[in-house]
Design a protein with these regions (language model features):
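A charged helix-plus-loop insertion that forms the helical arch/lid used to bind
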Residues: 55-69, 123-130
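Active-site loop segments of alpha/beta catalytic cores
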Residues: 84-270
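Short glycine/proline- and acidic residue-enriched helix-loop micro-motifs
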Residues: 8-11, 71-80, 133-140
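N-terminal basic, low-complexity leaders that serve as flexible interaction/assembly modules and, when applicable
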Residues: 1-59, 186, 191, 261, ...
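A gly/proline- and charged-residue-enriched helix-loop-helix capping module
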Residues: 60-98
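A short acidic, glycine/proline-enriched capping/turn motif at secondary-structure boundaries
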Residues: 44-47, 62, 71, 110-112
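Short, flexible active-site loop motifs that bind/organize anionic cofactors or intermediates
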Residues: 12, 63, 78, 171, ...
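Intrinsic-disorder/low-complexity, polar/charged segments
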Residues: 18, 69-75, 125, 256
Length: 270
């Protein structure tokens, strides 16, 4: 494929940091598939690196010096997105000048970024982030405040450079009990959504069925719904307040086209 040809010449992080190449792979699905929007090619950990965290991709992301105490949180820098990660915005500028369809930007939500930073990568049981969250509330709050500020600035700059939509991904938000999600995660998400200006906003948390009654307090434009709940049920519990997105198990994309169409049509009918 066209993407694989580019990847053979460069590593993933370098691709994210090279505006001409990142713009090219962003445009590829629009040209090849005719999709009605483009999704910025990047990675959710790009702004984390700008805080002073060492990241490698092997091929999954690895944090080389995980955050485990309040002193390490204190040592993290502050982010000035357009200075520290200017390559992201140069990519957006190129795309806005070339695309005839809307551009979707994105970021990782504070808790999901914290999971990577504290665990050192992906995890099966997330014991380190939970130990930090329950055992050092001051350190956890400081980390989440810093990440919330970082993500808000990062996304607002994406909007300012021309993204029509921005999405906040909380991939690991679903690891917590509902009451813990409400206390340790949701306030930071709400703050970001309340303060983003100038674009449509989308929030996705994996395991959303446990949190719908809290999430309906958000001010965002749309909610991403995973495949763990019927989309009609999610809409009902969200009081029909949001545009809903998703709901298809990604594994279905490995099936034949007729099977994919069947399941996608089922979601639209629901």
């Amino acid at each position: 494929s066209e993407y694989k040809q580019i990847r053979e010449k460069t590593d993933f992080l370098s691709l994210c940091k090279t505006p001409d190449l990142a713009a090219e792979v962003t445009i590829q699905p629009v040209d090849i598939l005719g999709v009605d929007a483009a999704i910025l090619f990047s990675d959710i950990l790009i702004p984390v690196e700008a805080l002073g965290v060492n990241i490698a991709f092997d091929p999954s992301p690895v944090i080389l010096d995980p955050i485990r105490n309040i002193q390490q949180v204190n040592n993290l820098g502050d982010i000035a997105p357009e200075k520290d990660i200017s390559f992201v915005y140069k990519t957006i500028d190129i795309l806005v000048s070339k695309l005839k369809v809307p551009l979707i930007g994105f970021a990782g939500a504070p808790f999901t970024l914290a999971c990577y930073m504290v665990e050192g990568g992906g995890s099966k049981n997330f014991l380190e982030i939970k130990k930090f969250m329950y055992g050092d509330e001051k350190g956890y709050s400081m980390l989440m405040d810093k990440l919330t500020d970082c993500v808000l600035k990062y996304l607002q700059a994406q909007i300012d450079h021309g993204c029509s939509v921005v999405q906040l991904f909380d991939t690991w938000g679903g690891i917590l009990a509902p009451k813990d999600y409400s206390h340790y995660v949701f306030p930071y998400v709400k703050y970001i959504m309340d303060n983003l200006k100038g674009a449509f906003t989308v929030y996705f948390v994996r395991g959303i069925s446990n949190y719908l009654e809290v999430i309906k307090k958000l001010t965002c434009s749309a909610i991403g719904v995973d495949w763990g709940i019927d989309i009609s049920e999610a809409n009902k519990r969200l009081d029909s307040r949001f545009v809903l997105q998703g709901n298809l198990d990604p594994a279905i994309l490995l099936a034949d086209v007729d099977i994919i169409k069947y399941h996608a049509s089922g979601i639209l009918e629901d």
